């Protein structure tokens, strides 16, 4: 919301500002625009599913910035329904889903920033939720760290110096950039849409599967970094090449999705569309 407040100044300067062009947010929002353009007259529900089926072999580590990751999963969850936000206790809504090329995983409802934009930009949408998968070992470690105060963002005094517990914890955990050579398995990230097309109910699932070891062989990084970095490059390319040219500040769902979707296939993140997928209750 704070970044959107500078939209007018970008318009006056004739500059295109692009927010959130990783995978989620980023690609998932482009998936929504693509579904709206090609598959639906009305989108009624969106479920964003982020599954990491990878294994790095450590007892506990995070796949991206530990401070951001642990804050995200320890915060209250929320989703958009019937025109307003519904807030829930952290990790209190759990579902199981069988992900293509990964298998069945437990996933939990979290707040995620792309919901804020999609709720405004997808006309008539009734519900938007975001789910992310976590294993039981990860959740047990996280709960223990929370119980002893290491997830706190409140500074404390230690040996005469001010430290933030979660920032201290970040220094103790494995650096996510070192996980590439030891991480095996795949990610599966996508969106399930339901709605109406030509007067009939329709549901589709648009998703990408990415292999950790294939990513490492290509760029010496695991799939979490790959699925974040490639979309950032594509978003930049869209703006630099003039394919996305609209002075102001926008999210990725506010542009024509077609060239971005074509670029995903070209640059290592091919996607699939499945009709009538298993829905999340």
Where do the language-model regions lie?
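Rossmann-fold dehydrogenase core element
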Residues: 7-22, 42-43
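Short alpha-helices
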Residues: 21-31, 36, 231-235
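Short, conserved acidic/polar surface loops in the N-terminal third of protein domains
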Residues: 7, 29-31, 58-59
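C-terminal catalytic/substrate-binding lobe primarily of soluble NAD(P)-dependent oxidoreductases
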Residues: 38-281
């Amino acid at each position: 919301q704070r970044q959107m407040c500078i939209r007018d100044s970008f318009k006056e300067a004739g500059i295109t500002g692009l927010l959130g062009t990783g995978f989620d947010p980023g690609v998932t929002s482009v998936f929504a625009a693509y579904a709206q353009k090609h598959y639906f007259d009305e989108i009624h529900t969106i479920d964003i599913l982020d599954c990491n089926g990878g294994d790095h072999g450590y007892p506990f580590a995070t796949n991206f910035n530990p401070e951001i990751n642990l804050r995200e999963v320890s915060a209250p969850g929320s989703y958009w329904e019937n025109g307003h936000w519904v807030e829930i206790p952290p990790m209190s809504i759990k579902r199981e889903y069988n992900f293509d090329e990964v298998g069945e995983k437990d996933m939990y409802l979290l707040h995620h920033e792309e919901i804020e934009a999609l709720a405004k930009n997808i006309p008539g949408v009734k519900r938007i939720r975001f789910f992310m998968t976590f294993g039981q070992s990860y959740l047990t470690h996280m709960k223990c760290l929370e119980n002893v105060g290491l997830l706190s963002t409140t500074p404390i005094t230690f040996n005469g110096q001010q430290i933030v517990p979660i920032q201290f914890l970040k220094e103790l955990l494995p650096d996510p950039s070192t996980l590439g050579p030891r991480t095996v398995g795949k990610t599966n990230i996508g969106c399930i849409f339901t709605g109406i097309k030509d007067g009939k109910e329709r549901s589709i699932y648009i998703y990408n599967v990415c292999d950790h070891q294939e990513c490492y062989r290509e760029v010496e990084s695991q799939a979490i970094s790959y699925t974040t970095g490639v979309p950032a490059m594509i978003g930049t390319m869209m703006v630099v090449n003039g394919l996305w040219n609209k002075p102001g500040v926008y999210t990725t769902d506010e542009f024509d999705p077609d060239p971005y979707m074509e670029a995903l296939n070209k640059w290592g993140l091919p996607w699939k569309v499945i009709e009538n997928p298993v829905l999340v209750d």
